[in-house]
Each structure stands twice: as C-alpha cells, then as structure tokens.
From Swiss-Prot:
Domain IQ, chain residue ranges per copy: 767-788, 789-813, 814-837, 838-861, 862-884, 885-914
Cellular compartments annotated: Cytoplasm
Annotated positions of the Phosphoserine modification: 1444
Family: Belongs to the TRAFAC class myosin-kinesin ATPase superfamily. Myosin family.
GO MF, any single term: calmodulin binding
Protein name as annotated: Unconventional myosin-Vb
Ranges for region Actin-binding: 641-663
Binding-site residues for ATP, renumbered to this chain: 163-170
Keyword annotations from UniProtKB, A to Z: Actin-binding, ATP-binding, Calmodulin-binding, Coiled coil, Cytoplasm, Motor protein, Myosin, Nucleotide-binding, Phosphoprotein, Protein transport, Repeat, Transport
Positions with biased composition (Low complexity): 607-619
C-alpha cells in the first residue's frame, strides 16, 4: 500500500509531544505524492503542518481503529508501535481501571497504589482451570498457565517478575505463590502452603527497606521453587537469594531507611523479653537514623514485628533462637553507635573502655570485650617470616566496623534463609516445581555504583533469555501453521554481556584489580578505558576520569567507579571473625563456622535431589578471609546468576513486567514519560518489535469470513462452504502485496497494519452504504413531509368553511330567541299587576269576616266552659265512691285468706312430722321443701305489698274526706251570697284572664317560634357537625386500623424474614461444620493410611484414645457408663469402626445438639409469629370455656374409669374366691358331712354382694346429681357475657366439684356402714337407709348451696370490679378522645396508632398468658392420661392373666389347640454373626441397577425392619452395632464411588428414607399424625433413637454435599462454553481481532465445545436419576436450586472477567439461554424451587448489556433495574463493555461516574465475584411413607435368605 492510500483524509496519527510523549491528530486532507508536510488537526482543534520525510520513512505513526483500543493483549493491535502500546495501556488503566494487560507472553502489571478486590478466593477459583486467553489478564491467569503446563507437559515452570523499585514485584510474586498454595494445596495436613506464605513477612522484614521510590522495596533478589508431587500437590519449597544490598545496613540516603527489622525491633523494645537488648527509639542509633526519617506513613512497625514473630514460630524457629536472632540484630545497632576516637598522630585511634554500646555489643554476642575493643582498632599483617599488628586510622577503623556489621547481617540473613528452607523441605519425592523469581529491574540513578551495575548485568542476562524465548515461540507458531518464514532480526545483547563477563571484561578486570595490594578504583577505571574504548557498548564520559558508561539494552548508564573495589572485596578481618567464632552463644558461633562440608544457606541440591535440574548453591562457600582463594562478590554473583540462568533455561518461563505509573505514588495516576522509560527497559517494546517484524495479526478463516464478508462480491459468496478459497481470493484482490499476508493451515497471518487497512476498507464500504441509505431516507422524508403539508392545507380549508357556516346559523338562532324573550316578558308584567289587585281584595275580605266572628265568640265560649266543669266534678264524685267500696272488699278478703293459710300451715306441719309422709316423700323431698319455701316467701311478699297498699288507700281516703269537707263548707258560704253579682264578677274576671291569656299566648307563641327556629337551626348545625365528626372519626378509625394492620403486617413480615435469615445462617453454619468434619475425617484417614506399616501396632496411648471416644451415643434407656462395657462395645464393633470415634466428632456432635435446639426454638418462634392475632382472639373467645369443660369432663371420666376398673377388679377377685371356696366346699363335702360352715359363709358372701350392689346404685344416683349440678352451673356460666370471668371459673369449680364428689362418696359409704343402726324401723331396714340417704343428700346440697353462694358473691365482686374497670377505661377513652380532637390531623393519626398499638400489645400479652395456661393444662392432662392408660393396660394384663389361670383351673384334661399361622408383623430377624453379611449384601456390594422395578428405597425399609426386631427383643448392643455398621458401610461406599452420581443419589435417598422411618415410627406424636392404625403398630417400643437420627441427618448432609460436588463437576466444564461462547441465536455475535493469548500454548487443540442442549441433557439425566431413586421432591428442588446458582455464579464470574463477552449480542444470547433453562424448569415442575431467583444477577447482567448507556435517564434505569448486582459488578461490566463494530459507541467515563454517584448509597459487599463454592443449607423435611412394613417383600437378588420374617 502506498502512502497516499494510508494517509488519507480523516486518518488519525500519532506525533511526538514533549509533555505527553505522544499526541493524537487527524488528517484534514489527503496526502499526495511529493507533499513535504501533512495538515493535521489536533485534539484542541488547532491546525498544524507536520513535516515528513517519505524517503527516510519519517512519517507519523498511524493510530489504530477505535474498535481495537482497550484490547487486553497489545499484540492484537493492528499498528504495533510505541504510541499505540502507551495509549492502550493508558486507556485500560485510567478509564477501565484495569491494571493487567498482556503483551504477547508478557503480563504487564501497572501498580495502582490502591487496594483492589481482585485477589480473593473467589477470583482464584474463577481462574482455576481456565485458559489464559479466555479470561481478563491477571497474575492468577499466568499462575494457572504455569500450573497447567506443568501438569500437562510434565515440565518445570518459572514465573519471572521484574520491574523497578516500587512497581509491585513483591506483591505480584506473593499473589502468585498464594495462587499455588490455594490451587495446589497439600493433600496431607502438613500446612506446607501456609509455611510458604509465612516466609513472606520474614523476608520482607530482613530484606526490604524504604527507598525514595518505594516504601517496601526488596533489596535482594529471590527465587522460590515450589515443589509438587505426582498429583501436583505442594509438598515443599526452597528459596535462593541474590545480591543482598549489605551497604544499606551501614548507610542510607536521605529519606530512606535501613531494613525493616531494625525499626520493628526498636518499636518493640519496651516488651519485657527485650529489656536485655538495651534498645531505645530508632533515632538514637547511627545505623537507623542516617536517612533522617525513621517512620513510614500508615505502617505500624510494632504490629509488623508481631507478624514476623508469628511467622518465625510457624516455620519452626524456636523461641530461644528468635531471642538470639534479635540479640544479633540489636548488637549491629550497638556496633554502629560505638564512638571511635582518633589519636593525635592520625594513624591510630581508640575506643573508650566505658563505651556503653561496645559493652552491649559484646554482651549480646557473648564475646570478650577487651579483645573486640583491641581488634576493632588494629589489624594483623602476616608475611612469610613474621606477623605484625598494625594500628589503623579512623577511616580504616570505621570501614572495618561497617564491614563487620555488614558481614554479621549477611550471615544472619543466610542463616534465616537456610532455616526457612529446612522448614519448607519434605521427605517426599519431588516430581516437578514452579519457580517464582522476584528480582530487581533495570535501574539508573544520578549516581550509580556497584549494586546498580550488578542489577543491570542480571537484567541483561534475563533480557537475552527473554528475547530468545519470544523468538522461539514466534517461529514455532509459523512452523505449526506451515507457512514460509524468514529469520526475524531481533536485538541481541550478547556483546553487552560479553563486555561485562567475558575474559578481561569489566568483572574480570575488577577481580584482577582487587588482587593487587595497592589497587585503587582509579587504576581500574583507567584499565577499562584502555581495554574497551573501542567497544560499541562502552563509552568514557567527557568530563570524568573515574566514571564509565555502559550501553545496556534499555538505556545508557553512567557508573561511578568509586567504591567498586571495596564492595567487590567485601573485606572482613580474620581476627574479628575469630572472636565471633569463640562466642559462648551457639548460634553466633554457628554463623561464622568455617566448615567447607556444611550446607550453605542457599544450597538446594539435597532438597531437590529428585528434580530434573541439579542446581548448585547461589552463594559459594565462605573461606577464611584475606586468603588468596577468597572469591569476590562479583565472582559470586556471576556464578549464582549463571546457575539461575541454567535453571530458567531448563524451565518454561512466564514473564510479569511491573510498571510504576508515577513517582508520587498517587492512585490511578498515569505519567506517560515514566511509563515509556519502563516499557523500554523491561522489554515490552522489544516484544512488540519482534511481533511486528513477523505476522502479529492472526485470523481464523471462519472469523475472517464473518468479519469481512461485506467486502466480498456476490459471485464470491456463491459457495460459502469453501470459506478458505473465498478468503484467499478476497485477500488477493484487496491487498496487492503478497508479502503482507500468509495463508496458514487454520489461520491467516497479516503483517502489521494490514488489519487496520482492512478495517478502513470495511468502514469505507459501510460509509458508502450509509450515504446511500441517507439519500434514500432523506428523499422519502421529503415526500412524506409534502404529503403531510397538502393534507394539512385541505384540512384547514374545510375547517374554515365549516366555521363560517356555523357562525351564520348562530346569528339566526340568537335573533329568534330575542323575540321569544320579549313576548314572555310582556306577558309576565301584565300577570304580576293582576295578581297584586286580586291579593289585596282577598285580604280585605278576610279581615272583615274575622271581626264579625270575634264579636260572636264570648257567649258561646262561656257556656262551653261551664259544661266542662260540671262533667269533671260529676266524674270525680263517682270514682271516689267506687274506690271506697273496692278497698273495703279487699281488706275482708285478705283477712279471710290469712286465716285459711294459717290453718293449712298447721295441718302441713302436723303431716310433716309423720313417718308415712317421710316415706312417701323420700324421693324429691328437697324439691318440695324448696317449693314450699318459695311459696311462703311469695305470700309474705304479697302480704307485705297488700298491707302497704291498704295503708296508702286509708291515708288517701282520709285526705279526700277532709278536702271534700272544706269544699262543702266553702260552697255553702258562696250559696249564701248574691248569685248574680257573683256571676258578673266571675264573668269579668274570666274576661280579663282570657285577654291576658291571649296576650301571653301570643307572646309565648312568638318566643316559642323564635326559639324553636333557633333550636331547629342549631340542631341542624349540630347534626351536620356531628355527621361530619362521625365521618371523620370513622375515616380516622379506618385509617388507624389500616395503618396498624400495615405496620403489624410489615413488622411481622420483617420479623419473619429476620428469623428465617437467622435460621438459614444457623443451618448453613451447622452444615459447614458437618462439611469440615467430613474433611477432617478424610484427612485423618489419609494420615492413618500413610502411617500404617505391616508391623505397626497401636501404642497404649493410641489404644486408649481410640477406646475412650465414642462416635455414637448409647440408645438404651439405661446408659452404658463403665469402662468394661465400653471396651466390650469397641471389641464388638471392631477396630476400624472404633477408629472413627474421634474427639472432634464428639465436640461437633455437642455443638450440633446446641444448634439443633436453637433451631427448634427459632422454628417455634417463627410459627408463633406467623399466627394471626385476630384468629387467636376469636378462637380463644369461642373455645376458651370449652377447653376447661372438656378438661373437667375428661377428669371426671378418668376418675369414673378408674373406679369402674377397681370395681371390676374387686368383683373378679370376689368371684374367683367364691368359686375357690365352692370347690373347696365340694371337696370337704366329699370327705366331711358338715355343710353348715359352707352355707354360713355363702350367705355372708351373698349379703356382701347385695350390699355392694346397693352401694353401686347409690354411687350412680349421686354421680347423676353431681353431673346435673355441674351442667346447671355450666349453663349459668354460659349466660355470662364476660370472657375473662368465664375463663377464670372452671378451675375453682372443678376443685369444688371434686371435693364435693369425694365427700358425698365417703358420706354414702358411712351411711351404708351404719344401716344396721336403723334396722329397727322396719323389717328390711329400707326406711332407715332412705332417711339416712336423704339426710346425707340434704347435707351435700346444703354444702353445694353454700359454696355456690360464696362463689356467686365472688363473681359479683369480680363483675363489680370489672364494671369499675370498664368505667375507668371509658373515662380514659373519653379523655383520650377529647385530647385527640384538640390535636392536628397528623397528630391525631399518630396518637390513634399509638393507642391502638398499646391496646393490641396488652391484648396479645393477655392471650399469651391464656395460651400458656391452656398449654400447661393440656400437658398435665396428657401426663395423667398416659398414667391412666398405663394403669388400664396393667389391669387388662392382670385380667388376662387371671382368666388364663381360671381356664387352667377349669380344665380337667389336656386339649391340643391348633394355632393359626402368624401374620407378618413387619420385622426381620437375623443372627449376630450374619450382621457383616447383611451389610455387605445390602450396602457395600449393592448396585442400584439390581433394584430396578422394586420399591424405591428398599434397603432403608429392610434396615428399619431389622432395627425394629432388635428393638422388639430389647437388644441394645444389636441396635447399636447394626446402625454403626450401616453408617460406616455407607461412608465406605461413598468414598469408593465419590464420582458416581447415580450411586451417591441412591444412598442419599435411602439414608433420608431410613431417617424418615426412624422419625415416623419413633412414637413421637408429632411424627405420627399421618400414620394409619397399622403403621402405629410398627413403632419402636423400647429405644429412643433421637441421637442416631441426628447422626443420620449429618450423614445425609454429607451425602448431599458430595452429590452437589459431583453434579457441579459434571456441569462446570459446559457452563462457559454453552452460556457465553456458543451461538444459540445465529448471526448475532460479531468477530473481533484476537491477540497473542488466543494463539498461545494455553490453548489446546480440539477443546470440547458445548451448547445449551448439553446442559439441558445433563439436567435431564440428573432429574431422571433423582426421581428414579425415590428422592424426596423437596430435596430435588434444593438440588436444582444449588445447580442453577452454580450456573449463575460461574457464568457471571466469567462475564466479569472477559472483555470479549461483554457486548450487546452476548446479552441477547444470555437472555435466550436463561429463558430456555426457565422453560426446562417449568416442564419439570421445578419452578417453585427458587432456581430462577438464583439466576436473577445473571438476568440483570444480560439486561445491562442490552440497555442504552448514554443519558441520565439511562443511568437511573440501570440503577433501578440492577438491584441484584453490586456496584462493583455494574461498574465492571460497563468498563468491560466492548462494541462489536465501529458504529456502536463505547460507554463513556462520565456515564460510569454517574452510575457510581447514584449507587454510592448502596451498602453492597466489597466482593466483585460471586462465590461459586457457596452451598445453600439443605433442609430435609419430614416425609412419611404410606407403605406398611408387612407389605414389603425382599427380592431374591439381594441374597438375604438368612433374614427371617417375624
């Protein structure tokens, strides 16, 4: 392609920028051949003419299409160059917050300087087993790739982590080791993975320090080999260290610190155990205060020191050794603070003997003070003939002291590393290993010394190895695809390496100069200039004669030669070392022991003897100092580095390059300049260059065809089956240069930039099609607009014409209406005048006629009143006469009747004294007495009434007589006067009175009318106001009721949810304990299997521990408590079974019981909360009395049954004795002839029998009377309205009735015993008996009446108290109502709600008390019923025994009785020795296929029938042994078939059925509600197997968890492929370019690809097996709920970790797949299982991928819809969202920030991924069987002939 084709208008390019390194621009016009510049538009819309040089290829870099921006693999970019790489990393880091990016085989990790939630266990499990290219870049993906290649290729692996200080190397290496520790955890309980992780805090403490660039910088390199066995479990580890920066011990730059351990020890100096160290704060010591800053922000040195100590303890370092280590570290601090004083001559110096620090140094190391004081200031010179002791200058002494301190620390460092390696070693054979190399990256500072030189030398070696490995992989890919390839020219840094390590190279010359006695750094620098001045990688600075420049692969570095010789020699004087060797502390002496045969700290030959690579020590053996053969530091480092490279070359390397984004340690801040420097230094750009030199872009033929089919012509698409030839023909027509692409076996290979060119052609094609579509659409829109305008114009015309017509019509109507109005008005005016004249005439006539009538009225009125007066006077006189006569007659009648009554009473009293009357009235006498008494009372009352009436009449009569006399006298006086004058006066007075009355009447009428109107108006107002108040009151009441109902329902719902949640959590914790126990049990068995040897015998301690623990509790009613029984039990069970009885299980069992009790309490509480309070109130009001009545009736019936049973027993005994006496009499008559004694005894017995019958009748009579009285009292109580009084009476009544009945019974008995005293009254004594009975009855009735009166008085008082209480309550309510009226409406509602809540609370408390009382009464009655039932059974047994004895006495000869064959009772009998055979045939060797066509869960039924027979025979040991053997047998079967779904489901269903049988037939009433009478006969009689039910429940939980694990293992490989990758809807998924990861070794050819139908088929298999095995439907629902949760978790986790899966088409595919799974659930009737709810997060994620993501409304819709997704998950999906084509926009950063702002109030968990290992707690609901035990038949295929049916 020409430049004119590439650089056309709208093409975007990169140009250099001094601030941002690279800047984006866009061409404003096409480039033409010959142009010397490009016209560019920058991002700020400025126009720039950019000069170019086409001849020298100096043109700006092309920018990749937007669809490629943000790729997780840099090699997937079409244009591979520095600005593209930098921009892609910046976009991923800043916009998507992705810190990991692939660059071919390299993982680029950018330090975020912030804690991210992407390293948890859930993330580890998500990456485990996944291909490296399938998931988002992560350190876990690299670790998984290494682990997978180690297992697949059986080759050792290495992970090389590099980067400059502060880039995150140590953290990355730590997470890689954590991944291996989690995924490859040790199979045995050795905690080796914990020890590997525990080494990190130790090495950080002694090898890390604060620098200017990093607060936790590793100042040494380390290579950790993690060893694996053949099963790829971690068995051990080994560590090798490189180039510890010893100079930091004695010197630190400004704002830097020494190693962390020094400051940690100073922070803990106040602890009691460290008092002898004599330490103070770090500022007081020279070695720790040199940098100026002794603290790190956010770091607690004391806390870190405690972690270091814990890690040392975990790795087996004894406490004494730890103290010794801390003493050595403290001694180094004291040594650095020793004051050295120079003498006057300047050639010598001295140390004060009283120097405190030197004394502490010698004391802590256990050496001689004087010797160390001397040899610190002197040195020994040895010649061939003599030995000299020479003084040293101050500078020499300081250097010697510093060298000694560095040497001590280095030796201690090596000793600690050696000890860590010993702790991580194992005796098992190592099969392979994975090495993690955490080594310093390329470094360059203003002043670079020996350390930087060694570091950069190591990076040169690693870069060489890296380049060769990348080149090798690139060539392998070409050879695999069978395409021609040429040698790629890549940078080879071997010349630079030769400059450093070759003969007479820099290191060789340095060693030679060190051997010269007078060698100096300046001489060495001159030799370098002379020797290597012509080398292309060596330069001499212009302004310096002591520095030199080495051109490394990353950059030029200038080294200052000062200090090279001293650091390379690392001189320590022999005399000082000898003093340390003589230390009295073993550890100090051991550090400096000169033993050539000892294993150095980093020697790994023995620990890796089985490894494929024999790696020698990285640190050569230390020889005596100052010897000629002592190796220099440079030589040691070169040797160890060569060994490291040999190890790495023998392994498969994996690279992690850590990038430091900024120097200020700001979170998610990207500095392009610093990033580019590190990209150049770490080899990322070299990887890009190698990839760009070949064919970096690779497409499969299928993907290329789908992506670029728009560029193909119609004739080329005729045959779509041969896609390979179609792609070839298209490419040859589109790209003319055949060198730009190659056709491989399965892929098409493109040169750099070709994919971008194809994308440009594709975009141009779409642009042309878009223009055509726009043209057509615009024309159509214009036509539609014209038609709409024309139609609108016609409509306007039509409406205007219609409007004019309607206006004319309206005018005509108005004119006609005006005429009509005028006519009507004129008529109305004339009518009004006529009506006025007529009304005046009528008024005049009415007044005239009224005046005439007024004149005629007075005479008529006077005559009428006189007539009325006469009428009333005559009537009064007649009535008075009649009343006098009637009163006289009544008095006479009363006197006569009183006389007759007295005579009758006297006769009755005489008659009552006679005996005949008593005899006649012996029955019902008390009723007659009561009737007579009532009659007398009535007569007395009547007499009293009549007497009062008589006196009243007499007094009235006397008053009337006096009044009449007065009137008569007045009348006579009036008659004597003049009658005419009197009449005139009367008439005149009457007239005046009449006028006055008229006037008063008028006034009163007017006032009455006014008041009446006012009152009516006021009444109407009040009625209206009252109606309003009533309506408002009703409305408020309804509102209060609604609010109270809503609040109560809401509170009850919340409480129910809370209780359910607590119950689920408790159940989950319990089942996790069961799971942990099974894991501990498995570990115990594994350890036991490992430790067992052919000659092994248990020691006494083991034997006792095994025999003392018991896994299963005793089941008998009397527990086995002594040691002999326990030993016997162990012997019977067997050693293997007894070995399972562990102390851990007993503790867990105890915990299980406690949790079960808490669960029951919570369940009861939940059931109580779910009851409706109103229903409880109604039921208690309706049934409160019935309960007590039933209790009383039941009590009386039980008493009666007890008396009847005792009576029957006495009667039977009497009959038996009677017959026995008769038999004896017959024998006596045969021998003796004197029957008198027999007849006398017989008569006495007859008399006693008759007396017994009489007593029986009397008891019946009394019982009838008592029951009648009880009924009367109950009926009287039922008439009472109050509920509380009703519920409080029965208990007292029952007590009184019981006492009365007992007293009556004893009284009758006493009466019967005294009947002979009354025998003189008549011949048979019946009269006396009757009289005594009546007397007792009368006493009884009198007592009952007294009790009733007392009770009635109490009830009256109680009712009065209740009435008072009700009055007070009414007053309170009235006051409350008045107060409520004064409040505002809102306050009224709130006040009403509070009052209603308080009332409901009080009522609930009352009801709870009543319920508790009734429950106690019920329990008491149940206990009494059980006692009486037991007595009845005993009586029946005694009667049966007596009858059998009687039959035995009656039989006089032997009779042979034919027995029927007994029916099968549902029990199976077996002998003790057949138990092992039973378990083997029924459990161990049983196959589920053998029971096809039989009853489901047949083994469970058979086992229960065997248990039932053992219970029937009361054999405790047999039941215990059988259940223990069954449980152990099931465990063995499950362990053997731990991957067989069918076998596991078979035993899950049988274990649950056996558990249900033990519940159903346990005899507990709660489990017997659905049993038939026949099934109740099959209940256990002797044993309580409650604790065994708990053991079986735990076993069921374990089996369920194993079943879920098997099912998940079968489903998990299908989920990602079927749910995310397979195209369920064809044609939706687009195709994107793939990166290097998709073609790396992580991809395996021929990987299985699953579709959704595979998951559905697997689900159908699970469902069919579970149903065929007879598993409970409730458990089946829980199984599929768990499986659907796992599908949801795995799919969502992969979606959150895969950028290629977050697209619109994936959302469509997910919705379709989920709908298919929901349809399957409905088809299997599993929609109630809650499985759909578990898929809710995935459903919302699919909807999120399909929603619009632009505006504020879209953000609100997303927040309201995605309620099941956490904030982190929503943001992660939006960050990962990737458009599939160039026409769909990316999600902007501002939109994501808007989502975060709206979701910040959510309290979501800080967990990104779902826990795919989470398991819902399983619940086994009780499911009784309808089968009876006697209907079960055993098939012959089970070989159980030794079982006998009983």
């Amino acid at each position: 392609m020409t430049y004119s084709e590439l650089y056309s208008r709208y093409t975007r390019v990169w140009i250099p920028d001094p601030d941002e390194v690279w800047r984006s621009a866009e061409l404003t016009k096409d480039y033409k051949d010959g142009d010397e510049s490009l016209q560019l538009r920058l991002e700020d819309d400025t126009i720039l003419d950019y000069p170019i040089d086409v001849q020298n290829n100096q043109v700006p870099f092309l920018r990749n299409p937007d669809i490629l921006v943000g790729e997780n693999d840099l090699t997937a970019l079409s244009h591979l160059h520095e600005p593209a790489v930098l921009h892609n990393l910046k976009v991923r880091f800043l916009e998507s917050n992705h810190i990991y990016t692939y660059c071919g085989i390299v993982l680029v990790a950018i330090n975020p300087y912030e804690q991210l939630p992407i390293y948890g266990q859930d993330v580890i499990y998500a990456y485990s087993g996944q291909n490296m290219g399938d998931m988002d870049p992560h350190i876990f993906a690299v670790a998984e790739e290494a682990y997978k290649q180690m297992a697949r290729d059986e080759k050792n692996q290495s992970i090389i982590v590099s980067g400059e200080s502060g880039a995150g190397k140590t953290v990355s290496a730590k997470y890689a080791m954590r991944y291996f520790a989690t995924v490859g955890g040790s199979a045995s309980d050795t905690n080796i993975e914990e020890k590997v992780l525990a080494s990190s805090p130790i090495m950080e403490a002694i090898g890390n320090a604060k620098t200017t660039r990093n607060d936790n910088s590793s100042r040494f390199g380390k290579y950790i080999e993690i060893g694996f066995d053949k099963k790829y479990h971690i068995i051990g580890a080994n560590m090798r260290t490189y180039l510890l920066e010893k100079s930091r011990v004695v010197f630190q730059a400004d704002d830097e610190r020494n190693y962390h351990i020094f400051y940690q020890l100073c922070a803990a100096a106040s602890l009691p155990e460290f008092k002898e160290l004599a330490l103070t704060c770090a500022e007081d010591f020279f070695y720790t205060a040199h940098g100026g800053n002794t603290t790190i922000e956010g770091v607690d040195d004391a806390e870190d020191f405690e972690k270091t100590r814990q890690a040392l303890t975990l790795l087996g370092v004894r406490e004494s050794h730890q103290i010794s280590i801390f003493k050595i570290i403290a001694s180094i601090l004291h040594l650095g603070s020793v004051e050295i004083q120079a003498e006057r001559d300047g050639d010598s110096c001295s140390i004060s003997p009283q120097d405190e620090h030197l004394s502490n140094f010698c004391r802590l190391l256990g050496i001689e003070h004087s010797q160390m004081e001397h040899w610190l200031c002197h040195r020994k010179l040895v010649t061939t003939s003599e030995t000299y002791v020479k003084t040293m200058s101050l500078q020499q002494v300081v250097n010697a002291r510093n060298a000694l301190a560095k040497h001590i620390y280095a030796q201690l460092f090596s000793w600690i590393v050696e000890h860590i390696n010993k702790a991580l070693q194992t005796s098992l054979k190592q099969h392979s290993f994975i090495g993690v190399l955490d080594i310093y990256g390329f470094e360059t500072f203003e002043i670079n010394s020996f350390e930087q030189f060694c570091i950069n030398y190591a990076n040169e070696k690693l870069q060489q190895q890296f380049n060769s490995h990348v080149f090798k992989l690139e060539q392998e890919e070409y050879m695999k695809e069978q395409i021609p390839w040429t040698l790629i020219d890549f940078y080879d840094n071997q010349p630079c390496i030769d400059l450093i390590e070759a003969k007479l190279g820099i290191l060789d010359l340095l060693d030679e100069e060190c051997k010269v006695p007078k060698g100096t750094d300046q001489n060495w620098a001159q030799k370098l200039y002379e020797r290597h001045s012509n080398s292309q990688h060596f330069q001499k600075p212009r302004m310096s004669n002591t520095a030199f420049i080495v051109i490394h692969f990353a950059d030029k570095v200038e080294y200052l030669s000062d200090g090279f010789l001293e650091k390379n020699r690392d001189t320590v004087y022999e005399e000082q070392i000898n003093i340390l060797k003589a230390s009295k502390f073993p550890l100090v002496a051991d550090l400096f022991r000169d033993d050539e045969d000892s294993v150095p700290a980093t020697n790994t030959a023995k620990s890796r003897s089985s490894s494929k690579i024999n790696v020698r020590s990285s640190r050569p053996l230390m020889k005596a100092p100052n010897k000629e053969h002592k190796k220099s530091v440079g030589y040691q480092f070169r040797t160890s580095l060569n060994l490291l490279m040999e190890t790495l070359n023998a392994t498969t390397p994996h690279y992690v390059r850590c990038i430091k984004p900024n120097d200020e340690k700001l979170p998610f801040h990207f500095d392009p300049k610093r990033a580019v420097q590190q990209l150049r230094a770490c080899g990322v750009l070299e990887t890009i260059r190698i990839s760009a030199a070949g064919y970096p872009s690779r497409w499969t033929y299928h993907d290329f065809f789908n992506r670029y089919r728009v560029l193909m012509k119609k004739r080329e698409l005729a045959n779509t089956t041969d896609k390979k030839n179609i792609c070839k023909s298209v490419l040859e027509s589109l790209i003319k240069d055949p060198d730009k692409f190659q056709f491989g076996r399965t892929k098409i290979f493109f040169r750099a930039g070709q994919v971008a060119y194809l994308e440009k052609l594709r975009a141009d094609k779409f642009r042309e099609a878009t223009i055509m579509i726009q043209k057509t659409v615009r024309g159509w829109l214009q036509r539609v607009k014209y038609r709409r305008l024309r139609a609108a114009t016609l409509t306007l015309q039509r409406f205007c014409r219609g409007y004019l017509a309607r206006r004319l019509t309206e005018h005509l109507r108005r004119t006609r209406a005006a005429i009509v109005f005028q006519k009507q008005y004129r008529m109305l005016k004339a009518r009004r005048a006529y009506c006025r004249v007529r009304r005046a005439a009528v008024i005049i006539q009415s007044y005239t006629r009224g005046h005439v009538c007024t004149q005629k009225l007075p005479p008529v009125l006077t005559e009428h009143k006189a007539t009325i007066i006469q009428k009333y006077a005559r009537g009064w006189m007649a009535r008075r006469h009649f009343q006098r006569q009637r009163d006289a007659a009544i008095v006479i009648q009363c006197a006569f009747r009183r006389l007759k009554a007295r005579q009758a009473l006297k006769a009755l009293k005489i008659e009552a004294r006679s005996a005949e009357h008593l005899k006649r009235l012996n029955v019902g006498m008390e009723n007659k007495v009561v009737q007579l008494q009532r009659k007398i009372d009535d007569q007395n009352k009547e007499f009293k009434t009549l007497s009062e009436q008589l006196s009243a009449v007499t007094s009235t009569h006397a008053m009337e007589v006096e009044k009449l006399k007065k009137e008569l006298a007045r009348y006579q006086q009036n008659q004597e006067a003049d009658p005419s004058l009197q009449l005139q006066e009367e008439v005149q007075s009457l007239r005046t009175e009449l006028q006055k009355a008229h006037s008063e009447r008028r006034v009163l009428e007017d006032a009455h009318n006014r008041e009446n109107g006012e009152l009516r108006k006021r009444v109407a107002d009040l009625e209206h106001e009252n109606a309003l108040l009533k309506d408002e009151k009703e409305h408020l009441n309804h509102q209060i009721l609604r609010q109270s109902k809503a609040e109560s329902s809401q509170s009850s719902v919340e409480e129910n949810l809370l209780i359910k949640k607590e119950l689920e959590e408790e159940r989950s914790r319990y089942q996790n304990l069961v799971k942990e126990y099974s894991q501990l049990e498995q570990r115990y068995e594994n350890l036991r299997d490992e430790q067992q040897t052919p000659g092994h015998r248990k020691n006494p301690s083991n034997q006792s521990s095994l025999e003392s623990d018991s896994n299963y509790p005793s089941i008998s009613t009397s527990e086995i408590g002594d040691t002999e029984d326990a030993l016997q039990q162990v012997e019977e069970i067997g050693i293997e079974k007894a070995a399972m009885d562990m102390t851990v299980f007993l503790k867990l069992q105890k915990r299980v019981r406690e949790l079960e009790q808490e669960r029951k309490k919570l369940q009861v509480q939940l059931e109580k909360e779910q009851q409706d309070s109103k229903k409880v109130q109604v039921e208690q009001q309706n049934n409160g009395l019935d309960v007590d009545q039933d209790a009383d009736i039941a009590y009386n019936s039980l008493k009666r049954q007890e008396l009847e049973s005792e009576n029957k027993k006495l009667k039977n005994d009497l009959n038996e004795r009677w017959k026995a006496v008769a038999d004896q009499a017959m024998q006596d008559n045969s021998t003796h002839s004197s029957p008198d004694s027999y007849s006398l005894l017989l008569n006495q017995l007859k008399l006693a029998n008759e007396e017994l019958e009489v007593r029986k009748e009397e008891v019946l009579i009394l019982r009838t009377q008592i029951m009648n009285a009880d009924q009367r009292r109950l009926s009287g109580k039922n008439m009472e309205p109050n509920i509380n009084a009703r519920t409080s009476w029965p208990n007292s009544e029952k007590h009184v009735d019981q006492e009365d009945a007992i007293e009556a019974y004893h009284g009758v008995c006493q009466t019967n015993s005294q009947t002979e005293d009354w025998g003189y009254l008549n011949e048979d004594g019946e009269l006396g008996l009757a009289y005594q009975g009546l007397k007792q009855v009368a006493r009884l009735l009198e007592a009952q009446l007294q009790a009733q009166n007392l009770k009635h008085e109490e009830e009256v008082e109680h009712l009065k108290a209740q009435v008072e209480a009700m009055k007070e309550e009414m007053d309170k309510q009235q006051q409350t109502f008045c107060q409520t009226l004064l409040l505002s409406p809102e306050a009224q509602v709130e006040f009403g709600v509070q009052q209603e809540i308080s009332r409901l609370t009080n009522e609930n408390l009352d009801f709870k008390e009543l319920v508790e009382k009734l429950e106690k009464n019920e329990k008491k009655l149940k206990k009494q019923l059980k006692i009486y039932m037991k007595k009845v059974q005993d009586l029946e047994a005694a009667q049966a025994l007596a009858q059998s004895d009687r039959r035995h006495h009656e039989l006089t000869r032997q009779v042979t009785v034919q027995r029927k064959e007994k029916d099968f009772q549902g029990m199976l009998e077996y002998h003790k020795e057949d138990e092992a055979l039973l378990i083997r045939n029924l459990v161990t060797d049983l196959k589920p296929q053998m029971l096809s066509g039989t009853v489901p869960c047949l083994p469970a039924y058979i086992l229960y029938m065997c248990i039932r027979h053992a219970d029937y025979t009361n054999d405790d040991l047999k039941v215990h042994s059988l259940l223990s053997s069954t449980i152990n047998g099931i465990k063995k079967v499950l362990k053997k078939h731990n991957e067989d779904f069918e076998m596991t489901s078979f035993w899950l269903s049988n274990t649950c059925r056996l558990l249900h049988c033990l519940k159903q037939y346990s005899g507990d009433e709660g489990f017997m509600t659905q049993n038939t009478a026949k099934q109740n006969e099959h209940c256990l009689k002797n044993f309580d197997l409650t604790e065994y039910r708990q053991v079986l429940s735990d076993l069921s939980i374990q089996i369920y968890q194993q079943l879920i694990k098997i099912a998940e293992g079968l489903l998990q490989p299908m989920i990602v492929s079927a749910m995310l990758e397979n195209e369920s809807i064809q044609g939706l998924s687009g195709v994107r370019p793939t990166g290097y990861r998709k073609r790396s070794s992580s991809m395996v050819d021929g990987e299985n690809s699953y579709c959704l139908e595979a998951i559905i088929r697997q689900m159908n298999f699970f469902h069919t097996v579970l149903c065929d095995q007879g598993l409970d439907p409730e458990i089946i629902l829980q199984v599929f709920k768990q499986l659907f949760y796992m599908i949801n978790a795995v799919t969502l986790n992969n979606l959150l970790l895969r950028k290629d899966a977050c697209s619109w088409s994936t959302g469509m595919q997910l919705r379709y797949n989920i709908s298919q799974l929901e349809e399957w659930l409905r088809g299997k009737n599993l929609q109630q299982s809650g499985a759909v709810q578990t898929m809710e997060p995935l459903i919302q994620a699919a909807q999120l991928l399909q929603l619009k993501k632009k505006t504020q409304e879209d953000a609100e819709a997303i927040c309201s819809l995605c309620t099941s997704l956490s904030t982190q998950q929503i943001v992660k999906i939006l960050n990962l969202y990737t458009p599939l084509n160039g026409f769909e926009e990316r999600v902007t950063v501002s939109f994501i920030r808007t989502i975060q702002a709206q979701l910040q109030e959510r309290s979501d968990p800080q967990q990104l991924l779902l826990d795919s290992k989470h398991m819902f707690p399983v619940l086994f609901p009780f499911n009784p069987s309808a089968l009876t035990m006697d209907s079960i038949h055993i098939p012959a295929c089970l070989n159980l002939e030794f079982l006998n049916e009983v």
